[in-house]
């Protein structure tokens, strides 16, 4: 309806079977003023595209529902892959894998590294395509020039959400901004959601999930406070403070460059 209004249309017509209850509910849920005309077994529906308070309310409600649903794979994944997992205990890829595997994550965790058979006793896989199952969430910690091809692999194998730890994007200048624009274009074309790039991850302390997809050195107590931070240094300090003060958190998101998932998206998710 919004696209039609932008092109100068003021009304829409549709024809459906009169007993197609599901389709009639779709029309009604639009919130647009509607007239129905039944003839024989068909029903003609005429929708006015003039916005009303009710149609605006319905549109905003649908947006909130869609945003919440799109972010769920970030916080409630059944399976997670760390792409760029490393054997070096000091590396971000190793710390991410260790955080996921050592904090009681209730899903399945996979390490992706084409040059290692095992990492910290965990079997590794050369690529997403070699995994025994699709994953919901991919945590990406590869060099910046490899990120775009990794996103292509994610889309091709059914990944639904990304956390891009890798830096070197809009925060470093014009070339980085251009690379980030290409990254965002790929993400949106494939219908994915992405936290980052240039972030340190996300966590969910829900006892049924216990997701720690960060390289922070702490996993906070479970609680009812949700937090996000653009600054990595501030985010790490907040997590350390929550541990020191014994303040429980529900979820934490390091949004980084906020190329896709924004604080506004998170507020809608947390509200719902």
Regions from the PLM with identified roles:
Residues 15-21, 60:
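Conserved, charge-rich beta-strand/loop surface module that forms ligand/interface-binding patches
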Residues 3-16:
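Conserved GNAT acetyl-CoA-binding A-motif
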Residues 21, 33, 50-51:
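Signature of alpha-helical transmembrane segments in polytopic membrane proteins
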Residues 15, 31-47:
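Conserved catalytic-core motifs of GNAT/GCN5-like acyltransferases
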Residues 50-272:
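Catalytic-core regions of core metabolic enzymes
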């Amino acid at each position: 309806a919004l696209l039609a209004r932008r092109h100068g249309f003021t009304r829409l017509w549709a024809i459906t079977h009169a007993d197609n209850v599901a389709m009639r509910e779709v029309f009604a849920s639009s919130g647009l003023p509607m007239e129905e005309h039944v003839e024989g077994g068909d029903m003609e529906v005429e929708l006015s595209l003039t916005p009303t308070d009710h149609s605006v309310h319905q549109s905003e409600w649908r947006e909130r529902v869609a945003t919440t649903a799109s972010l769920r794979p970030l916080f409630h994944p059944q399976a997670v892959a760390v792409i760029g997992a490393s054997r070096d205990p000091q590396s971000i890829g190793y710390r991410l894998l260790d955080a996921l595997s050592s904090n009681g994550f209730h899903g399945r965790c996979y390490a992706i590294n084409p040059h290692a058979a095992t990492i910290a006793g965990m079997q590794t896989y050369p690529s997403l395509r070699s995994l025994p199952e699709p994953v919901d969430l991919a945590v990406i910690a590869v060099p910046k020039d490899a990120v775009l091809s990794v996103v292509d692999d994610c889309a091709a194998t059914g990944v639904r959400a990304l956390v891009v730890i890798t830096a070197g994007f809009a925060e470093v200048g014009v070339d980085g901004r251009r690379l980030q624009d290409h990254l965002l274009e790929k993400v949106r074309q494939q219908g994915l959601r992405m936290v980052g790039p240039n972030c340190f991850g996300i966590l969910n302390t829900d006892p049924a999930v216990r997701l720690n997809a960060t390289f922070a050195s702490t996993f906070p107590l479970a609680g009812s406070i949700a937090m996000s931070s653009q600054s990595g240094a501030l985010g790490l300090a907040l997590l350390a403070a929550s541990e020191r003060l014994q303040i429980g958190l529900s979820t934490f998101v390091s949004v980084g460059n906020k190329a896709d998932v924004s604080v506004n998206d998170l507020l809608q998710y947390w509200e719902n």
